[in-house]
C-alpha cells in the first residue's frame, strides 16, 4: 500500500494558530483545495514557527488518479512533559487515544506550541 502514497506535488498553507491552538481555518482550506482541484491527498507536514507564531502546512498530493474528499482534524494532547529521559510512551499513548474516534486516517503530523502543548493533525478520508 505504500506505493499508493507516492506523490510529487505540494501545496503550502500558512496562517496563525487558532485561539484553541489548532490549525483552525487552515483545515477547511486544505479540504477545499483537495475537493476543488480533484487531487488525491497523500501526506501532510506541519511546522509551527515559534518566532513568527505561524503555521506552515504542506499537503503532498498526486493528480490524475483516484480522488477522494479529506477531512483535517486537530486534536490537543495537552502538555506531555517528561520526554527528557527519552521515554516517549506517554506521547505514543496520547496519540493512539487521539485517533480512536477518527476513521480512515491517511496520515498524521505532530506539532508543539511555544508553551509546550502537543497537538496532532490527522488527515482522513471524509
Model-derived features: where do they sit?
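Terminus-proximal functional modules
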Residues: 1-126
Amino acid at each position: 500500500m505504500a506505493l499508493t502514497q507516492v506523490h510529487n506535488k505540494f501545496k503550502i498553507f500558512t496562517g496563525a494558530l487558532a485561539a484553541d491552538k489548532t490549525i483552525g481555518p487552515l483545515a477547511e482550506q486544505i479540504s477545499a483545495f483537495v475537493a476543488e482541484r480533484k487531487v488525491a491527498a497523500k501526506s501532510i507536514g506541519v511546522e509551527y514557527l515559534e518566532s513568527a507564531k505561524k503555521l506552515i502546512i504542506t499537503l503532498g498530493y498526486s493528480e490524475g488518479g483516484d480522488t477522494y474528499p479529506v477531512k483535517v482534524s486537530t486534536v490537543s494532547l495537552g502538555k506531555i512533559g517528561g520526554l527528557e529521559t527519552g521515554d516517549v510512551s506517554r506521547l505514543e499513548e496520547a496519540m493512539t487515544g487521539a485517533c480512536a474516534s477518527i476513521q480512515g486516517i491517511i496520515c498524521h503530523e505532530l506539532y508543539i506550541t511555544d508553551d509546550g502543548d502537543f497537538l496532532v493533525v490527522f488527515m482522513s478520508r471524509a
